[in-house]
Amino acid sequence: MTKDDYVIICGDFGGVWNKDGESKMETSVLDWLDGKAFTTLFVDGNHENFDRLYAYPVEMWHGGKVHKIRSSVIHLMRGQIFELEEKKIFTFGGANSHDISAGILEPDDPKFKLKKKVLDRGWEPYRINHINWWKEELPSEEEKQEGLKNLQKYHNEVDFIVTHCCASSTQAIMSDGLYKLEMLRMKIRVNVCFQ
């Protein structure tokens, strides 16, 4: 293998997570990946620290926007098309957290400790804003529009789609119609979709 070989992680990478900056564990894992004989690529999932991830400078790489975490550990941003090995790869990370039915707590809420204690006692699924949940888990309108614009450049035809979550059309089949067909899946001609 060489650095021109790619391992692609379909979201929930976990290598950029600690709220206080890069921890010793993260440094160790990221340096280990960077030292491998391949390049690690990832799209974001819904369990990412978006404050830290989005703080990396945006760079162009193989035709699309990325965050370079290390020289060979690269976040493929949403709505981008990358040309690798003469293949067109459309990336669109993110997803809606399903483990937040009890809500999102605000750490600066005066009743935070009480609310957390009640939820913990009842084993209720919740998240804490900017600690283990970020609104950026879902794509912004700007990211959606950029994805559509980039797809139009390629006449809505790509070889691969890399995402974190399955298409809403797949969810619709599995959920007995609970989800509606999404705009992108209805327009794109694709050979393979990885999620």
Task: Please name every model-derived segment.
Residues 85-176:
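Active-site-proximal loop/helix segment associated with metal-binding centers of metalloenzymes
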Residues 1-84, 180-181, 187:
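Core catalytic region of metal-dependent phosphoesterases/phosphodiesterases
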Residues 158-163, 181-195:
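Proline-aspartate-enriched helix->loop->beta-strand connector
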